Curated annotation (Swiss-Prot):
Region (Disordered) residue spans: 21-66
Protein name (Swiss-Prot/TrEMBL): Uncharacterized protein YxzE
Signal peptide: 1-25
Record keywords: Signal
Biased segments, Polar residues type: 21-31
One Pfam family hit: YxzE
Amino acid sequence: MIVIILLFISIIVFLSVIQPQPSKNKSRQQADSGYFGYSDHSSHHDGCSSDGGFSDSGCGGGGGGD
């Protein structure tokens, strides 16, 4: 009986691992692309806000790192 349960669990895990992979890859690529694009744009546009201490001096001392 334990063998049957383990076999059943193995099949479920196997199917779960195989099925979402292609779909997950696509979603991940889109998410990565969108995230990087947004992050990059945001960083360039108002880096002072994003980076805080790093771009603080270049932004005109808006945040004051400390």
